Amino acid sequence: KTFVDECHKRGIAVILDMVFNHSTGLNPMNKLYPYGDDLKYNPWFNVTAPHPDNVYEDWNHDFAPAKKMMIRALNYWLTEYKVDGFRMDLSHGLCGTTYDAMDHITDYYEKGVKAVAEDAYFILEHWGPQMSSERPKLINQGMLCWDNTTNAYYQTAMGWLKDGDSFTNANRDGYVTYCESHDEERAFFKAKQYGNGDLKTDDEERIARVPLNMAFLTLLNGPQMFYHFAEFGFDYSKYQNQYGQWGPNPYSIKD
């Protein structure tokens, strides 16, 4: 609470990353029932996720107690901690036993967010085959949707003109765009591996060019996301060890 209050004193909004799509076997709702092959006896989770890109165990949002728990969690963070909104991980997975997430997403926004905080942010990481038709509808209801423009930023970072201007939704209201995230490689790494001419071999050339991406990003309409440690010019792959982006850094920040 102190953290949120101090951020607000400085004009900084606090947005929580909420993972309502999936959970692991450590979750209490998983421990209430047999696990593994007997997951079918657990009403809180789907045996097989009805949507693409799933990880771990998939929450069954058709199960009324599960949905009630999610709504209460959103209410609680907004009223008790006064956070400014949420980024919903893998939002196209907020579905029940069939691949239809729209009604559940709308309920979470209306009952979980707007019912207690009219102006709170509700940002959806909305991928999947239905995103092209669903995202405009969600935006029209007041929500925001992720828009992945990393390839265009990669091209500019690497010094290639092809697709470097592909920012289809990047400057439109309702979309949250970004240069990098934990799901993609860092732009510095791409420039070091595949850069045009001296960009591939010359550190100074990369340092002079790649940070320009952030200038492009901040000039666009709406909110933008800055991926941690980009400010230090980290240029190693997120797969540089067995732990991926959660592994130890190959060199310390002070270096």
Positions of PLM-derived features:
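Extended, charge-rich helix/loop segments that form flexible
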Residues: 184
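Active-site-proximal helices and loops of the catalytic beta/alpha 8
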Residues: 8-10, 73, 79, 90-181, ...
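Short, basic, glycine/proline-bearing loop/turn elements
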Residues: 187-203
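Glycine- and acidic
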Residues: 59, 198-199, 251-254
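Substrate-binding/active-site clefts of carbohydrate-active enzymes
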Residues: 1-82, 90-101, 105-117, 121
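Short, solvent-exposed loop/turn and secondary-structure capping segments
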Residues: 25-32, 134-135, 188-190, 229, ...
